[in-house]
A protein has these predicted regions:
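Basic/polar phosphate-binding segments, predominantly the helix-turn-helix DNA-binding elements
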Residues: 32-35, 43, 90-99
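Helix-turn-helix
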Residues: 7, 11, 15-49, 53
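A structural signal for repeat-array scaffolds
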Residues: 92, 153-154
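Hydrophobic alpha-helical connector segments
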Residues: 53, 64-92
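Amphipathic alpha-helical packing segments from all-alpha helical-bundle domains
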Residues: 101-142, 149, 156, 160-170
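Alpha-helical DNA-contacting segments of helix-turn-helix folds
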Residues: 44, 50-58, 109-112, 116
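Solvent-exposed, amphipathic alpha-helical segments
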Residues: 11-19, 61-69, 143-151
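Short, Lys/Arg-enriched anionic-surface-contact patches
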Residues: 1-5
Length: 177
């Protein structure tokens, strides 16, 4: 990836994470970056191609998250540290989930679930020591994941909130046993 693209991708990624595709205003982003908007069109041609680059960048970031999650030994603090470190990636994924009416977004959400979901589920099952069938664990995780993405925002993705969230999730899961 060329250096000229990286500032656009970094700002675009964060902007998409906060506002979705509708927030990708080229002129406003050019002003923030202090470069001409013609630079954007030189690198990406149009917003659709730019979003494709952002989706690819997101998948690359999720591969890194998956490796880190696979090495985590606990939810608190290890997994929470990872989630805080990759805050913008979670928020980007949240926007994709909210716009699942677009086929390209659905594909990326499904791929990210495969990448990051498995390591997280294994850690969660180990730490909670649940006596659930694999089907029940998968269903509970799916609900928890949807709930998680509905609740997160740029202000609450920090250690305190995440710790409380996972404690509550643990309490709910134990109540279902």
């Amino acid at each position: 990836m060329g250096n000229g693209k990286q500032p656009w991708l970094s700002l675009g990624y964060e902007t998409f994470a906060l506002h979705g595709a509708a927030g990708l205003k080229i002129e406003a982003m050019a002003k923030q970056l202090g470069i001409s908007k013609s630079s954007f069109y030189h690198h990406f041609a149009d917003t659709e191609i730019f979003i494709t680059h952002l989706l690819q960048y997101h998948l690359e970031r999720c591969e890194i998250i998956a490796i880190k999650e696979a090495n985590a030994k606990s939810i608190d603090p290890e997994l929470i540290d990872i989630l805080v470190e990759f805050k913008w990636d979670l928020l980007f994924n949240r926007q994709l989930r909210f716009s699942r009416n677009q086929a390209e977004y659905i594909q990326v959400v499904n791929k990210t679930n495969e990448l990051v979901g498995n390591a997280f589920v294994m850690l969660w099952v180990k730490e909670l020591n649940l006596n659930f069938s694999p089907e029940k664990i998968a269903a509970l995780f799916e609900l928890a994941l949807e709930n998680f993405y509905l609740q997160i925002n740029s202000d609450n993705l920090h250690h305190t909130w995440l710790s409380e969230y996972f404690q509550n999730l643990k309490r709910l899961a134990k109540a279902m046993e």
